[in-house]
Amino acid sequence: MTWRDEIARRVRGEHLRDAPLAPRTAVRVGGPADLLCRPADGDALSALLRAVRELGVPLSVLGGGANTLVADAGVRGVVLRLPQEFPGESTDGDTLVLSAGAPISRLPARAHAHGLVGMEFLGGIPGTLGGAAAMNAGTRLGEMKDVVTRLELATPDGTGFVPASALGYAYRTCRLPPGAVIARVEVRLHPGDVAASEALMREDRERRRATQPLYRPTFGSTFTNPPGEYAGRLVEAVGLKGHRVGNAIWSPVHANFVTNLGGATARDVLALVRLARARVQERFGIALETEVRLLGEFLEEDLEGLDGHAAAGGGPGAASGGVRPPEAT
């Protein structure tokens, strides 16, 4: 029995072998996963975490595919993708608990249905709630740390809620315990003017459509903004707006967005990222930090010149191991 057979035997849920990942990412780039798993519930999720630990198989987490670049060679081991409908969602007064695999849009929809506001910054942000919570997603209107009260974390030993105050929330990041996966997200909002909230979110979506290249595949912002600066302005200032490598391009619309013109490779994308980092460092003395998570087997030369955040390959509640799995048959 192969490790893929063993995981399918132990873990209730959906198991897809050699699953294409490019269609499951926003930028539409990358190779397949040895095994893509969608556990049926929290117990199945913990069973999966136990299985990969005991079998020595790497585990990575894929949310909605935003802010993620998958290697052209794909991802060895197991890629976990939580189903959108995960048991245990609830609403109690001003507190909502939602599945980490749910689309971000579910939170404002559920909140508005109960007369709650306070999450207007989520208007137009793609991805899943788990990914948003792990990366502290946000805009000028606010960020996830403003509303998250607790995260339910799954480990090989079970699941439990951890207060947000213990997770070291900071700009576009938080500190999850090693090996933990976000299963559910608890947020606290407040009663308010739902119509005004909807109008503000609609305005933010329209602003994004007018200023960002959302008509092409893109993983979103490539770099975080340095203090007092805008990454897009820096990339444009060094002459890279509209610069193309292969079928990937620094967008002529917004210079902090790499877009896929059709058939782009991860290598094309990383060439653009490395070039921008080098030029901005040389001209301005600023080391741009990527907001993009790398997933899979990249060539060392493709990772050269990237910051540690990207090269580490961590992710939204991901337990990412360096152990090469047995032959995936």
Curated annotation (Swiss-Prot):
UniProt catalytic activity: UDP-N-acetyl-alpha-D-muramate + NADP(+) = UDP-N-acetyl-3-O-(1-carboxyvinyl)-alpha-D-glucosamine + NADPH + H(+)
Localization: Cytoplasm
Keyword entries, A-Z: Cell cycle, Cell division, Cell shape, Cell wall biogenesis/degradation, Cytoplasm, FAD, Flavoprotein, NADP, Oxidoreductase, Peptidoglycan synthesis
UniProt pathway annotation: Cell wall biogenesis; peptidoglycan biosynthesis
Entries under Pfam families matching the protein: FAD_binding_4, MurB_C
Residues in FAD-binding PCMH-type domain copies: 28-192
Biased composition (Gly residues): 311-320
InterPro entries, sorted: FAD-bd_PCMH, FAD-bd_PCMH-like_sf, FAD-bd_PCMH_sub1, FAD-bd_PCMH_sub2, MurB, MurB_C, MurB_C_sf, Oxid_FAD_bind_N
EC number, as in UniProt: 1.3.1.98
Gene Ontology terms: cellular component: cytosol
Main localisation: cytoplasm
Any one Gene Ontology BP term: regulation of cell shape
Molecular-function GO term, any one: FAD binding
Keyword Hydrolase: no
Co-factor(s): FAD
Active-site feature positions: 172, 221 (proton donor), 291
Region named Disordered: 307-329
Role played: Cell wall formation.
Family: Belongs to the MurB family.
Protein name, as recorded: UDP-N-acetylenolpyruvoylglucosamine reductase
Native organism: Anaeromyxobacter dehalogenans (strain 2CP-1 / ATCC BAA-258)
Lineage: Bacteria, Pseudomonadati, Myxococcota, Myxococcia, Myxococcales
